């Protein structure tokens, strides 16, 4: 998740990209997230007064429906959601228009700090004071082309950014992720009111809400509240885009994530995207099926639901699935049991000698098949310090590794060491490079 972000928003041809390039030194920008869309968000970073700042350039917003305007507006709204502060840039020589008023109203509804910047003022006397009719306390006057006045704008931006180096949390991070109305807030409240005492609140350390350090059965855990995207939108995709972006950021930031599914609905596109992202990127997750009290159940209903999830997401037997009712508090204790078990698994230390003996026994049970002109031989192994269990195997030649044998080795590790809820990463290194 990027921190200390400025989004540049405005109509076409008001100088957004000129300001963007002035800030980043005209370096080539990077297009993120949505290849094939005509005008994606452009990201870069720059330094001001010794502080590293991220900036997003966006496409020009218009009321008139032109080609790709819906996509441009979606991209702009996502940029606003990501930003700590928004620069609303206008043509300072031109009169205010209905497009400008519409954009400013949209920015006000976002709740983000807004800095109104009147551009194209190589000659300050040409400034149209009608821009104050927007209601902004101050309108900064600049020339992005020549760099005039930009320093004052950046000094104002710094007031809304957080450069506290102590933001790194020493606690285990748990996030609750789900689409709107899946029950995230209810689950957070169930954990809060019934199972923990608040140790401290950390406000302002995330754009996605408030983080609370809680104590669960003697374990201090930082819970990341990702709730909050519930507002209506004229563009159908906007809410899901924002929710997906927020959820993926939480997955990246967390040590463990609870992916909350609404059992009263079919598995949603949102759920599939989040679970798929977690599995592809080796993120520890617990799938939590909520509102289970509303389901007409038989003795086999729970197992049938588990099978449906397993069939949808192949090769993930390590992902635990729990069924709860956040509203009634049913099975919340069981969910906490799993959270603490996964935490224990992620933090487990293994002596190199124990791991090496396990791998040697595995090779005796099933030797590696010939592959690429040779047969793999593993001499010794060790576990490295990492957010997920990561094992380094020192071998005769890593080109002899067949994917099926790597899968076999992972299965042997899981059968002998408790790693429920944890992805496993195996790295092969040639023995001659063991000190790399």
UniProtKB/Swiss-Prot annotation:
It comes from Mycoplasmopsis agalactiae (strain NCTC 10123 / CIP 59.7 / PG2) (Mycoplasma agalactiae). GTPase that plays an essential role in the late steps of ribosome biogenesis. One of its GO terms (biological process) is ribosome biogenesis. NCBIfam families: GTPase_EngA, small_GTP. Keywords: GTP-binding, Nucleotide-binding, Repeat, Ribosome biogenesis. HAMAP family: GTPase_Der. InterPro entries: G_ENGA (IPR031166), GTP-bd (IPR006073), GTPase_Der (IPR016484), KH_dom-like (IPR032859), KH_dom-like_a/b (IPR015946), P-loop_NTPase (IPR027417), Small_GTP-bd (IPR005225). The keyword Nucleotide-binding applies. This is GTPase Der. Pfam families: KH_dom-like, MMR_HSR1. GTP 1 binds at residues 10-17, 57-61, 119-122. One of its GO terms (molecular function) is ribosome binding. The gene is der.
């Amino acid at each position: 998740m990027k921190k200390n972000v400025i989004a540049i928003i405005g109509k076409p041809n008001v100088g957004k990209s000129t300001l963007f390039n002035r800030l980043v030194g005209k370096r080539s920008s990077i297009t993120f997230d949505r290849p094939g869309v005509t005008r994606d968000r452009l990201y870069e970073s720059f330094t001001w007064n010794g502080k590293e700042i991220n900036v997003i350039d966006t496409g020009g917003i218009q009321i008139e429906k032109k080609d790709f305007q819906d996509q441009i507006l979606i991209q702009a709204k996502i940029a606003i959601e990501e930003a700590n502060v928004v620069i609303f840039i206008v043509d300072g020589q031109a009169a205010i228009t209905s497009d400008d008023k519409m954009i400013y109203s949209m920015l006000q509804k976002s709740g983000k700090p807004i800095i109104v910047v009147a551009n194209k003022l190589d000659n300050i006397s040409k400034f149209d004071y009608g821009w104050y009719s927007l209601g902004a306390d101050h309108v900064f006057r600049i020339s992005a082309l020549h760099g005039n006045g930009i320093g004052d704008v950046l000094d104002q931006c710094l007031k809304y950014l957080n450069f506290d180096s102590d933001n790194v949390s020493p606690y285990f991070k748990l996030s609750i992720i789900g689409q709107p109305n899946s029950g995230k807030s209810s689950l957070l409240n169930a954990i809060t009111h019934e199972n923990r005492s608040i140790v401290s609140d950390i406000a302002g350390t995330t754009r996605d809400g408030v983080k609370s350090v809680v104590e669960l059965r003697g374990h201090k855990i930082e819970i990341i509240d990702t709730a909050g995207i519930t507002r209506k939108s004229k563009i159908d995709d906007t809410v899901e885009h924002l929710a997906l972006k927020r959820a993926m950021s939480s997955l990246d930031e967390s040590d463990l994530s609870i992916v909350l599914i609404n059992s009263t609905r079919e598995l949603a596109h949102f759920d599939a995207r989040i679970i798929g992202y977690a599995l592809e990127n080796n993120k520890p997750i617990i799938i939590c099926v909520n509102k289970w009290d509303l389901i007409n159940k038989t003795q086999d209903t729970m197992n049938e639901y588990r099978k449906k999830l397993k069939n949808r997401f192949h090769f993930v037997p390590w992902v635990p699935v729990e069924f709860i009712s956040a509203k009634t508090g049913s099975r919340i204790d069981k969910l906490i049991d799993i959270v603490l078990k996964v935490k224990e698994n992620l933090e487990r230390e293994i002596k190199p000698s124990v791991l090496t003996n396990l791998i040697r026994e595995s090779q005796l049970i099933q030797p590696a098949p010939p592959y690429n002109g040779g047969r793999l031989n593993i001499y010794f192994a060790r576990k490295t310090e990492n957010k997920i269990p990561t094992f380094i195997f020192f071998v005769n030649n890593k080109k002899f590794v067949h994917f099926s044998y790597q899968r076999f080795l992972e299965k042997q590790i899981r059968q002998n060491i408790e790693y429920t809820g944890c992805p496993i990463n195996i790295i092969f290194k040639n023995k001659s490079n063991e000190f790399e």
